[in-house]
């Protein structure tokens, strides 16, 4: 009988620990949301941040992007489709987060391209050919310049800008903002300041749908 009482007591204790852990996690999540809501808008978007979609959109997706990240490559068409299907209601803001080896070269080239109005063609090329230059087991950032040649980029100017203090400072600013927002992996998504609670394609779509509904009274276009 005593053994049964001990086992029952242990089971109850485990249940209580589980309940406390669940409520504690929920409380921390809610607290984080409150803290993020109090962050200045500049931590989500900077004057240099590349954008895709209407500047008048009421819903803004901020993506912390690493061009060498395979998951970022997988999400790239999904996010652009969300923008295109929403007819001016959603805008994408890109932030540079070169966590992987070789990605620092890539984001410098991307920012140099942005200075020429060529961010999206160059980014598209780097994402498309990611396996060529950004493979985890053997990154080859030295191939990046040859890959983006032919996109219409002024190569001489881009090479100068990519190693400039201005570009370096902008990448460092994005990394500092990523740290401030607790971004530790890519892609990192925020929709109107709200982070994903769970990571996944459906979760991104659902969070955008909620914000579109809140702002416009209609969900994401199919």
Regions found by a protein language model. Name each.
Residues 1-23, 145-222:
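C-terminal cap of thioredoxin/glutaredoxin-like
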Residues 27-42:
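Ser/Thr/Pro/Gly-rich low-complexity linker/stalk segments immediately outside membranes or between
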Residues 39-40, 70, 166-167:
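Short, flexible loop segments at the rims of nucleotide/cofactor-binding pockets, characterized by
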Residues 42-59, 83-84:
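A short beta-strand-turn-helix
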Residues 50-52, 133, 196:
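Short clusters of hydrophobic/aromatic residues that line enzyme substrate/ligand-binding pockets
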Residues 54, 63, 198:
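Conserved strand-loop elements at the edges of beta-sheets that form or border functional pockets
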Residues 57-68, 73-149, 179-184, 209-222:
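Structural alpha/beta surface segment adjacent to cysteine/selenocysteine redox centers
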């Amino acid at each position: 009988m005593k053994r049964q009482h001990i086992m029952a007591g242990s089971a109850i204790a485990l249940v209580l620990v589980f309940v406390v852990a669940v409520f504690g996690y929920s409380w921390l999540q809610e607290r984080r949301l409150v803290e993020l809501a109090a962050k200045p808008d500049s931590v989500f978007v900077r004057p240099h941040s590349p954008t895709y979609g209407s500047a008048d959109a009421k819903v803004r997706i901020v993506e912390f992007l690493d061009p060498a990240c395979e998951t970022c490559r997988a999400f790239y068409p999904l996010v652009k489709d969300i923008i295109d299907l929403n007819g001016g209601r959603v805008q994408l803001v890109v932030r540079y987060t070169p966590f992987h080896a070789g990605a620092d070269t890539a984001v410098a080239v991307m920012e140099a391209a942005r200075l020429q109005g060529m961010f999206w063609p160059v980014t598209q090329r780097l994402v498309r050919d990611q396996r060529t230059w950004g493979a985890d087991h053997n990154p080859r950032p030295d191939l990046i310049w040859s890959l983006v040649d032919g996109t219409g980029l002024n190569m001489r100017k881009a090479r100068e800008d990519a190693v400039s203090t201005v570009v370096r400072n902008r990448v460092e600013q994005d990394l500092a903002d990523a740290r401030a927002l607790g971004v530790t992996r890519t892609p990192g998504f925020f929709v109107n300041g709200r982070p994903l609670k769970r990571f996944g394609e459906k979760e991104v779509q659902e969070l955008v749908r909620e914000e579109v509904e809140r702002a416009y009274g209609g969900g994401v276009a199919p």
